A protein has these predicted regions:
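Phosphate- and divalent-cation-binding pockets in alpha/beta enzyme and binding domains
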Residues: 60-61, 130, 228, 255, ...
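Short, surface-exposed amphipathic charged segments that create phosphate/polyanion-binding patches used
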Residues: 87-99, 165-170, 283-287
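Generic C-terminus detector
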Residues: 284-307
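Conserved core of the sugar-phosphate nucleotidyltransferase
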Residues: 129-218, 223
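A C-terminal functional module that forms or caps the active site or interfaces directly
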Residues: 229-265
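Conserved N-terminal catalytic core of the sugar/cofactor nucleotidyltransferase
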Residues: 1-11, 28-122, 127-132, 140-141
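Catalytic beta-strand/loop signature of glycosyltransferases that borders the donor
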Residues: 213, 268-274
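A conserved hydrophobic position in a structured secondary element of the catalytic/binding core
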Residues: 53, 220-221, 280
Length: 307
């Protein structure tokens, strides 16, 4: 099987953040979180990264992150997630501006990924060095058998929430052997004085345990996954166009949940010893900047990632 490829989802709108957080500098030499992920991935063994962006941000992206990554040893490929990139017979609903979701993003990168296994990450999450190591090691040996052989890196919910508003997380159920049995995307999770809770309707709130495992969209897939997205996307569109044509999204956790329910995939939940950091909101940025500065001071990163 081909060497694992890193896929970076950087096409999101950043509506909660109020800007292009994919390119917002957090490092001492202008590095974005994405630079650190590329650095850690290369250290773990990845040699090719596919970065998914929107055509509308291409120029800004290339002038900042793209220019820096030319100095990295990683082979960088680009893919573009566009609203109009739909199966034959479908068109964009009038008034729709929101991307079609994370599964669609990965599908848009299919040509750049080729027939390689892939790890998928968000551009604006800092996952930590050990996360890249464990997922690369898993993907090197992954092989579909009776079920598709997938994996994910899990994090404790309590370590992934912010004081600055709600977040979206995939809430996981895991069996005694360490395999995912269920995942549910909760799009409005918040801290409150008594703990952590979520709401679906903005009125009724349910508590969540701080130590429950969540997905931060760090997935590992064998090549079969692209075909699963391709086959299932039209059915998603049929439902979306009927129920919520302007906002429905084809999420990776939703697709994984379907495959688990159908008994077609196994998903090993891997754990990382490193802390997660992210910038859902602009107010999250100072803590991320301070954390990365401390990691550099501790010798985990050079002062300038790309020399």
């Amino acid at each position: 099987m081909a060497q694992p490829v890193l896929v970076v989802m950087a096409a999101g709108m950043g509506s909660r953040y109020g800007g292009l957080k994919q390119i917002d500098p957090v490092g001492s030499h202008g590095e974005a979180i994405l630079d650190y992920s590329i650095y850690d991935a290369y250290e773990a063994g990845f040699r090719t990264a596919v970065i998914i962006i929107k055509e509308a941000i291409r120029e800004d992206f290339m002038q900042t992150v793209g220019k820096r990554l030319e100095r990295s040893p990683m082979e960088i490929r680009y893919a573009y997630q566009e609203l109009h990139d739909l199966p034959e017979g479908y068109s964009v609903p009038e008034g729709r501006t929101k991307p079609w979701g994370t599964s669609h993003a990965v599908l848009c990168a299919a040509d750049a990924i080729g027939d390689a296994p892939c790890a998928v990450i968000n551009a604006d999450d800092y996952y930590g060095k050990s996360a890249f190591r464990v997922i690369y090691d898993y993907l090197e040996k992954a092989a579909d058998g009776e079920k598709f052989d997938y994996c994910m890196v899990g994090y404790e919910l309590g370590k992934t929430v912010t004081d600055n508003g709600t977040v979206a997380r995939g809430i996981c159920k895991i069996d005694a052997e360490g395999f995912l049995t269920d995942i549910r995307e909760r799009t409005r999770i918040a801290k409150y004085p008594g703990g952590i809770h979520f709401t679906e309707d903005g009125e009724t709130w349910e508590d969540l345990p701080k130590d429950v495992t969540v997905s931060m969209n760090f997935w590992g897939y064998t090549p079969s996954f692209l075909q699963q997205i391709r086959e299932r996307f039209p059915a998603f569109l049929d439902r979306a166009l009927e129920k919520d044509p302007l906002k429905s999204e084809f999420y990776l956790p939703g697709l994984i949940s379907d495959l688990l329910t159908e008994g077609k995939a196994s998903v090993r939940v891997l754990s990382s010893t490193d802390r997660w950091y992210g910038v859902t909101y602009a107010a999250d940025k100072p803590a991320v900047v301070a954390a990365l500065r401390q990691l550099a001071a501790d010798g985990r990163y050079p002062d300038s990632l790309w020399g």
